């Protein structure tokens, strides 16, 4: 049965609405929509005759026009797969999913992000991903002996947690050490200048740059969550082109692209974040980022008929 009315409620999928949820809620209200917050853990599949198969709390009889994904909480492998299954199923039912499950999968996994950037020729640091401690140790010895430091990161992670710099003589993390979890994700350390640590966050919405900032810190990790300061930044053409190419490489509605410039001026993409925070960016940029996100999201609603459930 097709809907015969337009439901103006929009689920924001998150376990913790916080400041970002409040900003999105206000932006939706300004456009005549009502934001409702639903944790993905409260959604489930219900495969019954004459049912679309996906149940969202508060949308048992009619599926929403779209859902705005603001968070996919961590958990066991099975729990995370289940939450992504919900996003995949909603998209198959012609519900607009922003960002969709595939985009989140491509970017939450740093190895796949790096591979896609490499595949599309987007400049990114030399990277190795392996399970073998022997392989990882050999890479570390070779690179550090050549005076190239490494950075080890958790395959899944954000806000700079678990990121470490490896230099010659440093002890190597054991396979099941915290934030390693049996997989070694190694990148060449990009030297932006000792004592002048900085990188850039470029916020991309629908293949255009919405806003950007430079992050400066008293440590080589410049993440705002790690105490970095923010300044508004207007990307030069090369940086803008690289940021847009990175977003295109992972095929995503919106994202935060982290870029670093080395001592010689060369730019590298460090990461692409599919559920980026923008509180720090909003503090230094005049653009209303939540409104721009909501406007883009709304523009993608109604592309096709939505399937509705039968009570």
Where are these regions (language model features)?
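Conserved N-proximal alpha/beta basic substrate-recognition cap immediately N-terminal to
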Residues: 15-126
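Structural motif
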Residues: 68-70, 151, 185
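Rossmann-like NAD(P)H-binding beta-loop-alpha module
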Residues: 120-147
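A long amphipathic alpha-helix within ATP-dependent nucleotide-binding catalytic cores
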Residues: 188, 220-269, 280, 290-311
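Glycine-rich phosphate/pyrophosphate-binding beta-alpha loops
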Residues: 273-286
């Amino acid at each position: 049965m097709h809907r015969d009315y337009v439901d103006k409620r929009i689920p924001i999928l998150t376990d913790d609405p916080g400041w970002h949820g409040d900003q999105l809620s206000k932006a939706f209200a300004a456009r005549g929509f009502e934001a409702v917050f639903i944790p993905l853990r409260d959604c489930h599949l219900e495969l019954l005759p004459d049912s679309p198969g996906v149940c969202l709390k508060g949308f048992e009889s009619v599926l929403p026009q779209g859902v705005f994904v603001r968070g996919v909480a961590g958990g066991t492998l099975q729990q995370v797969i289940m939450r992504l299954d919900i996003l995949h199923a909603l998209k198959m039912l012609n519900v607009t999913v922003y960002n969709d499950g595939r985009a989140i999968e491509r970017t939450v996994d740093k190895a796949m992000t790096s591979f896609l950037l490499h595949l599309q020729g987007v400049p990114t640091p030399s990277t190795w991903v392996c399970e073998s401690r022997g392989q990882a140790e050999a890479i570390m010895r070779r690179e550090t002996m050549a005076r190239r430091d490494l950075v080890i990161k958790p395959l899944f992670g954000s806000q700079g947690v678990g990121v470490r710099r490896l230099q010659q003589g440093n002890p190597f993390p054991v396979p099941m050490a915290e934030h390693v979890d049996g997989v070694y994700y190694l990148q060449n350390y990009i030297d932006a200048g000792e004592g002048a640590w900085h990188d850039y966050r470029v916020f991309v919405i629908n293949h255009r740059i919405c806003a950007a900032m430079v992050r400066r810190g008293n440590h080589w990790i410049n993440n705002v969550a790690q105490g970095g300061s923010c300044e508004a930044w207007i990307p030069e053409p090369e940086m803008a082109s690289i940021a847009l190419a990175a977003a295109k490489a992972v095929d995503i509605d919106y994202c935060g692209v982290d870029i670093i410039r080395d001592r010689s001026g060369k730019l590298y993409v460090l990461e692409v974040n599919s559920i980026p925070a923008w509180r720090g960016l909003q503090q230094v940029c005049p653009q209303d980022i939540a409104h721009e996100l909501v406007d883009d999201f709304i523009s993608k609603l109604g592309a096709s008929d939505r399937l509705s459930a039968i009570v």
